[in-house]
UniProtKB/Swiss-Prot annotation:
EC numbers: 1.1.1.25
Binding-site list for NADP(+): E76, G124, A125, G126, G127, A128, N148, R149, T150, M151, A152, R153, I209, G232
Sequence similarity: Belongs to the shikimate dehydrogenase family.
NCBIfam families, alphabetized: aroE (TIGR00507)
GO MF, any single term: NADP binding
Coiled-coil annotated spans: none
Record flagged with keyword Flavoprotein: no
Role: Involved in the biosynthesis of the chorismate, which leads to the biosynthesis of aromatic amino acids. Catalyzes the reversible NADPH linked reduction of 3-dehydroshikimate (DHSA) to yield shikimate (SA).
Organism: Staphylococcus aureus (strain NCTC 8325 / PS 47)
Protein name as catalogued: Shikimate dehydrogenase (NADP(+))
Keywords: Amino-acid biosynthesis, Aromatic amino acid biosynthesis, NADP, Oxidoreductase
Length: 268
């Protein structure tokens, strides 16, 4: 079976390394490549994928929303998130999914077992935030709180959440067990500070969905304060495992995938 990840740029993607490690571990001769598709060529997506004879593919920035009009069916989770990161090609039909939310939550559950009783604050109200919030809302008992700079961003949400400003989030920071940053602040090349951690409780788990850099500025600051931190590496691995399950109906080897990514990040 042939798979790929599409994006622009795409040379930095660790998806091929991760998926190939999984294939090797499971004794599969499947292939996985990275395809750079510029925005101006995206209208040729059906032709490009058809020529590659793919059975499924992942989508990353900047095409997660752009792919939707080309799909025959979109899964509920992807509709809720407003973005697609996984496509299954079956009987000539393109089916879109979003595994980012479930990927993040599965990873978070492994480090925070009592997740269903946690008071959670999500920073940012974009597609990543929405996907994670919808997944958490399925079983977390306390109402989720989502903070954003502008309240207008919540107009596309139909989830029962507490909607607050970032200024209010700073004030009430001590009330949360878990704080999750879903904004680009702290990504490689972006040193913007999203929130002041002055009122962060020492017992709060500080999380970021980014894994490059391995510790974003907000995670470094929380760690200096003595808090436990959790980055986006597991989200990346688990979303990949969920994609593999959608394509093949098989369980992925999580350990081999994570090891391959860690080795790559360490430059081994």
């Amino acid at each position: 079976m042939k798979f790929a990840v599409i994006g622009n740029p795409i040379s930095h993607s660790l998806s091929p390394v991760m998926h190939r490690a999984n294939f090797n571990s499971l004794g599969l001769d499947d292939t996985y490549e990275a395809l750079n598709i510029p925005i101006e060529d995206f209208h040729l997506i059906k032709e490009i994928i058809s020529k590659k004879e793919l059975e499924g593919f992942n989508i990353t920035i900047p095409h997660k929303e752009r792919i939707i009009p080309y799909l025959d069916y979109v899964d509920e989770q992807a509709i809720n998130a407003g973005a697609v990161n996984t496509v299954l090609i079956k009987d000539g039909k393109w089916i879109g999914y979003n595994t980012d939310g479930i990927g993040y939550v599965k990873g978070l559950h492994s480090v925070y077992p009592d997740l269903e009783n946690a008071y959670i604050l999500i920073l940012g109200a974009g597609g990543a935030s929405k996907g994670i919030a919808y997944e958490l809302a399925k079983f977390v008992k306390p109402k989720l709180t989502v903070a954003n700079r502008t309240m207008a961003r919540f107009e596309s949400w139909n989830l029962n959440i507490n909607q607050i400003s970032l200024a209010d989030a700073e004030k009430y920071l001590a009330e949360f067990d878990i704080v999750i940053n879903t904004t680009p602040a702290g990504m490689a090349g972006n040193n913007e500070s999203i929130i002041n951690l002055k009122h962060l409780s020492p017992n709060t788990l500080m999380s970021d969905i980014v894994y490059i850099p391995y510790k974003t500025p907000i995670l470094e600051e929380a760690e200096r304060k003595g808090n436990h931190i959790y980055n986006g590496l597991d989200m990346f691995v688990y979303q990949g495992a969920e994609s593999f399950k959608i394509w093949t109906n098989k369980d992925a080897d999580i350990n081999s995938m994570k090891t391959a990514v860690l080795q790559q990040l360490k430059g081994e």
